[in-house]
């Protein structure tokens, strides 16, 4: 039963995501022209994102992880190829332009938003053709650490599910 519905009076007290107030383009309420999006300036991370974007293929379902893989979405759309594949993130957005930084987990011009458990059902069932994941640490044998670096315990998130079920995985990072 619902005891009460509380409507937030001050939008600043109820952000849609860490990096924005309500944005209807991230809920599917409306679409914005792709030319209106801001693209990140050239940097080492964007260069890696540009190289990784060269692995994109038409008609594939793609998962983008947190960190450097966030740049791939923007690069794909900056180059005019973002509509040729379906970009997803584990939080649930399907299609559109997945966002990075404090907006990570959202997608502008999203086509669908799945509850996260259903997104993982799709991932676990082999629905991802190509995954781009960050690597916090890698050793000479190719072992990847994404869960604990120094005193920070980030946890593995969806890394295990995605790496074990995606048809192809591309790791993105600096050394």
Q: Which residue stretches match the model-derived regions?
A:
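N-terminal active-site beta-alpha-beta segment that forms phosphate/nucleotide-binding
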Residues: 31-116
